[in-house]
Amino acid sequence: MPFKRKDLLGLRELDVHEIEHILELAVSLKEINARPIKKVPTLRGKTVIHLFYEPSTRTRTSFDIAAKRLSADTYSITTAASSMVKGETLLDTVKNLEAMKPDVFVLRHTVSGTPHRIARHTTASVINAGDGMHEHPSQALLDMMTMLEHKKKLDGLTVAILGDIAHSRVARSNIWGLRKMGAKVILCGPITLIPPEAHTMGVEVSHKLGEIIPEADVIMVLRLQKERQQQMLLPSLREYSIYYGLTAEKLKKARRNVLIMHPGPLNRGVEISPDVADGPHSVILDQVTNGVAVRMALLYLLGQK
């Protein structure tokens, strides 16, 4: 099935067949990363520009490696290195870069909706690498790829998403993607960190971690942003950890083959204990590995437009 979209802006707008197509392609491309020479000429002569206006380690590095393994030329621009520090708007930056004839922009921005706005004003393809609290589609795709590798299916799985869901673009993309693929999604966290629109998203909500652990095939732990305590959304990090931190003791109630996931970066000892993060149920590093394959698939599909 050909991928007809110019851009990849979010999972909410993709259908099941498009998601399946991306995941199948990612699986086929993953073996390139195990070769002694990890490079194919697929995107030779193509140019990918990374525009990151928010800190990133895994996503930016992963996209850069993915592009280079497909033989694309890559260039990275951050806020500090861009003309935005001189007052230039993002749209003007993109229009000037577009005049240099790139093929793909990979864009991360603090403001929700920014990739959509930029995509309307450029002929190059745009990949959303995370926009505000809105979406992070490539993260959700690599999460689903990891679940498929270990569980062999998504349809019928019960996936619990634990933590600061209200402010999480990772959670939103996973909700849209997993629900479309037939998974049951349970959100768990304090009432102050559950989005008010949760009841409209086709998910279940629980405020008691002990109730959802025995039911889950996958537990996805989200990073607790420490500024939430300063915003008075939490009494303290210690209290959050007591009630919602995932520990080996709490995991004793879990299914024997439960998967533990985390998009990173981790706050060890807050939302997840070190023995769980590094334990036998953890597939956190598998997520990182699969991130390269998923981003290769996205660049493959959009870079050849």
UniProtKB/Swiss-Prot annotation:
Enzyme Commission number, as recorded: 2.1.3.2
Pathway: Pyrimidine metabolism; UMP biosynthesis via de novo pathway; (S)-dihydroorotate from bicarbonate: step 2/3
Gene Ontology annotations of biological process type: 'de novo' pyrimidine nucleobase biosynthetic process; 'de novo' UMP biosynthetic process; amino acid metabolic process
Statement: the UniProt record of this protein carries the keyword Cell division: no
Alphabetic keyword roster: Pyrimidine biosynthesis, Transferase
Entry binding sites for carbamoyl phosphate: 58-59, 108, 136, 139, 264-265
Domain of life, per lineage: Bacteria
Classification via Pfam families: OTCace, OTCace_N
Gene Ontology cellular component list: cytosol
Residues that bind L-aspartate: 86, 169, 223
Catalysed reaction, written as an equation: carbamoyl phosphate + L-aspartate = N-carbamoyl-L-aspartate + phosphate + H(+)
GO molecular function annotation: amino acid binding; aspartate carbamoyltransferase activity
Function per UniProt: Catalyzes the condensation of carbamoyl phosphate and aspartate to form carbamoyl aspartate and inorganic phosphate, the committed step in the de novo pyrimidine nucleotide biosynthesis pathway.
Similarity comment: Belongs to the aspartate/ornithine carbamoyltransferase superfamily. ATCase family.
Assembly, per entry: Heterododecamer (2C3:3R2) of six catalytic PyrB chains organized as two trimers (C3), and six regulatory PyrI chains organized as three dimers (R2).
Protein name (record): Aspartate carbamoyltransferase catalytic subunit
